[in-house]
Design a protein with these regions (language model features):
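N-terminal glycine/serine-rich phosphate-binding loop of ATP-dependent small-molecule kinases
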Residues: 1-109, 121, 140, 233-236, ...
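Active-site core segments that coordinate phosphate-bearing ligands/cofactors
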Residues: 2-7, 13-15, 26, 127-198, ...
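Short secondary-structure junction motifs
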Residues: 21, 82-85, 229, 356, ...
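Structural motif
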Residues: 77-80, 226, 415
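Flexible loop residues that form catalytic
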Residues: 93, 239, 428
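Hydrophobic or amphipathic alpha-helical targeting/insertion segments
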Residues: 104-107, 113, 125-131, 137
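Carbohydrate-associated surface elements
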Residues: 116
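A structural motif corresponding to the C-terminal end of an alpha-helix
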Residues: 223-230
Length: 514
């Protein structure tokens, strides 16, 4: 890579590898404005009911293509060279797990996506080992309940069920990791010197990292029978890990790595204890910054690492509530039952009616996450009458996202002793004005939407820009993004009455099996 001119702007790139797409975005370190980007959709593979996979090589190819295409766009649209990039950060879908051979560089099985439910039987076997089948028995170490959601069960399933994984383990060539590890290993050389690392935010979603030591825990690894040598080295969220090994961005340092929801916390400037954000994408994820305190939830939330910006800085912890199905419910309306032809029809269709007609939709397609943690829950639609129209069901699907967010907000208020007085939001779905208004109405607090909704990528870029040796950003100088505010418009009585019926519908979803 050619040296950068003294007059060239300092730009920071961010790889945003999500459930539905891979992207590369470039931001100005002076203004935080996005300069250029490229995006490629990523398909999910569903070989059996409850199974959700993605092809690791397809994801990696998409990331390389995004880097190449953005380099071209920078040149053609902005007359900028890639040597203006000071560093690259990574924001990735969490919990999704891959096993690969370090000699060949090839995946040994498709990546098991966070939504996947195949490990329900693995969970059942593990719970048989603990007193009273207590799924919270490890929370004092890792902050998480035993659930198919988290990576340890996915790794255990791969070790138990995939012959190629077993053979690589015997041969000493097996590596496992979440998607950040797969990306960084390939970007830094793959079989030819690739670095096998992860960061504290991604590691905190595996059930294998000790929240206090921020290292792989011997007791946890023993419980799941996962050899520690298979796992990546844990780093902070902001430091130079290595450099891009090839392509138009060869030599540019990779200087941050964060799970997408943690990156959004940073991108929203939720840096103070008590601040929170909710990201709306395939799922919905609400994180509450608890500062240096590890808060043990008694109301169905999980304790996780918020971020750690460099080896010499303190770790910030968070409480999190995760909703499995948010945007995925809209995709289901389109692809599975044909209620709409395009997702863009959903908002105008829901606006045709002023209420859901007392219809309640619980989209528990793969169980319910926080605060219920019911892996045997399945989707239900309640309250249908002969008057029910397509618009009512679509609006009920929209309201389901908002009700699930309220479930989490109420749990957070109980755990922290103080209710949130506002909700900062981000993610692609926040462009839906009706969804944002319903969220304000059903939670009873203002909803704050930034004009630049893709804050996960911005957070990864910020973490890269403040890394030691990069230092093109001062985190204290970064302004919170301009925003729109949605304020509640319904009475407290109406809000609480509808929420009571939602809780009734949720109870009806429990107890179903695949």
């Amino acid at each position: 890579m050619a040296p950068k001119s003294d007059k060239a702007p300092n730009l920071v790139g961010a790889i945003d590898e999500g459930t539905s797409s891979a992207r590369f975005l470039v931001f100005s370190s002076q203004t935080s404005r996005m300069i250029s980007s490229h995006q490629i959709p990523i398909d999910k593979i569903c070989p059996k009911e409850g199974w959700v996979e993605q092809d690791g090589e397809v994801i990696m190819d998409a990331v390389w293509e995004c880097l190449e295409e953005t380099a071209i766009k920078l040149k053609e649209d902005n007359e900028l060279e890639v040597n203006c990039l000071s560093a690259i950060g990574i924001s990735n879908q969490r919990e999704t797990t891959l096993a690969w051979d370090k000699k060949t560089g090839k995946p040994l099985h498709n990546a098991i996506v966070w939504l996947d439910m195949r490990t329900a039987s693995t969970m059942d076997t593990l719970l048989g080992k603990v007193p009273d089948r207590d799924k919270n028995c490890l929370k004092n170490l890792c902050g998480l309940p035993i659930s198919p959601y988290f990576s340890a069960l996915k790794i255990r399933w791969l070790l138990d069920n995939v012959d190629a994984v077993k053979e690589a383990l015997e041969d000493g060539t097996l590596l496992v990791g979440t998607m950040d590890s797969w990306l960084i290993w390939n970007l830094t050389g793959g079989p030819n010197g690739g670095i096998h690392i992860t960061d504290v935010t991604n590691a905190s979603r595996t059930m294998l990292m000790n929240l206090k030591t921020l290292q792989w825990d011997n007791e946890l690894c023993k419980f799941f029978d996962i050899p520690k040598e298979l796992l990546p080295e844990i780093k902070t969220s902001s430091e130079v890990y290595g450099r891009i090994a090839e392509g138009p961005m060869e030599g540019i340092p990779i200087a941050s790595c964060m799970g997408d929801q943690h990156a959004a916390l940073l991108g929203q400037k939720c840096l103070k204890k008590g601040s929170a954000k909710s990201t709306y994408g395939t799922g919905c994820f609400l994180l509450y910054n608890t500062g240096s305190e590890i808060v043990d939830s008694e109301h169905g939330l999980v304790t996780t690492v918020g971020y750690k910006l460099g080896p010499n800085n303190d770790v910030a912890y968070a409480l999190e509530g995760s909703v499995a199905v948010a945007g995925a419910a809209f995709a289901w309306l389109k692809e599975n039952i044909g209620l709409v032809e395009t997702v863009t029809e959903i908002e105008p269709l829901a606006n045709r009616v002023h209420h859901s007609g007392d219809v309640y939709f619980v989209p528990a397609f793969s169980g319910l996450y926080a605060p219920y943690w019911q892996s045997d829950a399945r989707g239900v639609i309640c309250g249908i009458t002969e008057e029910t129209q397509r618009s009512h069901i679509v609006r009920a699907a929209m309201e389901a996202i908002c009700f699930q967010t309220r479930d989490i907000l109420e749990a957070m208020a109980k755990d922290c002793g103080t209710p949130l007085y506002k909700l900062q939001v981000d993610g692609g779905m926040t462009a839906n004005n009706l969804l944002m208004q319903l969220q304000a109405d059903l939670c009873g607090i203002p909803v704050i939407r930034p004009h630049m909704a893709e804050t996960s990528a911005l957070g990864a870029a910020i973490a890269a820009g403040v890394a030691g040796g990069v230092d093109v950003w001062d985190i204290n100088d970064i302004q919170a993004p301009a925003n729109d505010i949605f304020r509640p418009r319904v009475t407290e009585f109406e809000r609480n009455n509808r929420y009571l019926k939602w809780k009734m519908a949720v109870e009806r979803s429990f107890g179903w099996e695949i």
